Amino acid sequence: IEQELPKDLEQEIREAFAEMSQGEDIAVAVRSSATAEDLPDASFAGQQETFLNIRGIDNILIAIKEVFASLYNDRAIAYRVHKGFEHAGVALSAGVQRMVRSETGTSGVMFTIDTESGFNDVVFITASYGLGEMVVQGAVNPDEFYISKALLNAGKPAVIRRNLGSKQQKMVYADEHSAGKSVKIVPVDKAERNQFSLSNEELVELAKQALIIEKHYGHAMDIEWAKDGDSGKLFIVQARPETVKSRESQNVMERYILKEKGDVICEGRSIGQRIGAGTVRVVNSIHEMDKVQEGDVLVSDMTDPDLSLIHISEPTRLLS
């Protein structure tokens, strides 16, 4: 991080940002984009760093170096080993993207397939207040919506299911604007928690865009979106192939039978359709990874990308 960027590269970055900002004090996201990212069988999602609400060219230059360095963080190295990629064969760029004011609006992720069952005739949309990282990281329980592709294409009411999430927290801009200090997490008002974060009209518009993107790429897609709280406009900020359910056979249905019965000690939103058993290990931070042994059931408060290190090194099951 202390190493200086090549002078010609730094000058090009400064000139490009000056053209983008036109003298305004704009907030940008500095995002990673690797040459091996978003392949049909390996998404690399969340393996490298992204920094939000970065302001000022000096902070942007530092954030770019942080992104470059994240190509060799622990989880990125472990993921490449797991997927069989040569370290030297993966290059990384840093994109500087003007931010949507979703900190005062909503954001989330949508899939052109049901991520639980693999049913491909719906668009599945998740939404919560504030910046989208909370949804992407699994740090918040978002609203969930299912939109029928057939009804959407027929011009009929297409929202067929809505699940109200707790949406207890949101990520917003912080007062500082440097990498690692530019965002903060605050509680969501009770009134907002108790109402859906998107209208039916907004859901239909997002779903239409999702189908356009899916048709363009010819593949089930994983799409990040954001709503500007100031203008009310919806934006697509990223799209990548969906790499899990879309690769499973559509001609096979697996069912699992629980052979023993016991007391229910906790319930939550299902993220899969399998049954696991083993010794429960509660992990409060990535620094407690050494607790986890092969076959354990890992319990964590959220699905942090760093936990992929545990999945790769030891076969485990995750409960968050």
Predicted regions and their residues:
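NTP-handling and nucleic-acid-processing catalytic cores
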Residues: 50-151, 156
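A short, polar/charged loop-to-alpha-helix boundary motif
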Residues: 132-139, 243-254
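Conserved catalytic alpha/beta cores of large enzymes that bind or transform nucleotide phosphates
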Residues: 126-222, 269-273, 294, 300, ...
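Single conserved hydrophobic/aromatic residue that forms the stacking wall/gate
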Residues: 311-320
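Short, flexible loop/turn elements at secondary-structure junctions
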Residues: 34, 98-100, 129, 200, ...
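Conserved metal-phosphate-binding beta-hairpin within the catalytic cores
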Residues: 46, 219-243
